[in-house]
Amino acid sequence: MEPTAPSLTEEDLTEVKKDALENLRVYLCEKIIAERHFDHLRAKKILSREDTEEISCRTSSRKRAGKLLDYLQENPKGLDTLVESIRREKTQNFLIQKITDEVLKLRNIKLEHLKGLKCSSCEPFPDGATNNLSRSNSDESNFSEKLRASTVMYHPEGESSTTPFFSTNSSLNLPVLEVGRTENTIFSSTTLPRPGDPGAPPLPPDLQLEEEGTCANSSEMFLPLRSRTVSRQ
């Protein structure tokens, strides 16, 4: 169900018309001849005879028009009656358009203001939802910190290691807790240099002598075999 559009009350419309007269005061004081509208305004009970006499006491046309606008602002129907009088005169219809445009402009501004107040008063979440959301975020943060603290382990070197889901190196796809076993496997499968290879440690003296003796007699060990093979043929 769509929300209803805001509407202006009678008080709002009266305020709009009063503001329109105030905004156009300088312009209307130059264009309006107050005496031309006395009869119609008195017939509609907008002005009294005393009011017209008070207006007529002003020394200039602009001052008389200004005093007339003062009386019209005090009456909720003052502006409407002035427009009717101008229409009856048929000589200043451009004033009607000017007044109408100003009233419509102020009316739209008032409606936008009321619409903004209505939107700001609407709660996007149910009562207490914002508090519950902030409380939930706080609980999750506390739980995460506690979980992180409970899973941290320290190696002899002082390096810290956390559980697999806190590991930042996801490309390895290896649990952090198994790093030690993985390293052991790598080191155990690496081939060590053999005696005599570059980088191999020197052999003890007794092993060197034994190895040299073995190499010197290797040809003699195979001679009897070859001699026996030849004799059989």
Swiss-Prot record:
Phosphoserine PTM sites in chain numbering: S138
Cellular component per GO, a single term: protein-containing complex
Upon changing A5S, the result is:
Found in a MALT lymphoma sample; uncertain significance
UniProt effect for mutating S218F: Found in a germ cell tumor and other cancer cell lines; uncertain significance
| One Pfam entry name | CARD
Instruction: Outline the extent of the CARD domain.
Output: 13-101
Which PROSITE patterns does the protein's record reference?
A: CARD
Q: Which positions form S-S bridges?
A: none
**GO BP:** adaptive immune response; antifungal innate immune response; apoptotic signaling pathway; B cell apoptotic process; cellular defense response; cellular response to lipopolysaccharide; cellular response to mechanical stimulus; immunoglobulin mediated immune response
Report biased composition (Pro residues) as residue ranges.
195-205
Annotated site residue numbers, Cleavage: R228, T229
Q: What is the effect of changing G78R?
A: Abolishes NF-kappa-B activation
Q: What happens upon changing K31E?
A: Found in a MALT lymphoma sample; uncertain significance
InterPro entries noted in UniProt: BCL10/E10, CARD, CARD_BCL10, DEATH-like_dom_sf
Give compartment(s): Cytoplasm, Perinuclear region; Membrane raft
Consequence the record notes for mutating L41A: Abolishes cell death-inducing capability
Keyword presence, Mitochondrion:
no
- Crosslink position(s): Glycyl lysine isopeptide (Lys-Gly) (interchain with G-Cter in ubiquitin): K17, K31, K63
Q: In the record, which positions carry N-acetylmethionine?
A: M1
Q: Where is this region: Disordered?
A: 187-233
Subunit note: Homomultimer; homooligomerized following recruitment by CARD domain-containing proteins that form a nucleating helical template that recruits BCL10 via CARD-CARD interaction. Self-associates by CARD-CARD interaction and interacts with other CARD-proteins such as CARD9, CARD10, CARD11 and CARD14. Forms a complex with CARD14 and MALT1; resulting in the formation of a CBM (CARD14-BCL10-MALT1) complex. Forms a complex with CARD11 and MALT1; resulting in the formation of a CBM (CARD11-BCL10-MALT1) complex.
Protein name in the entry: B-cell lymphoma/leukemia 10
Native species: Homo sapiens
The UniProt gene name for this protein comes to BCL10
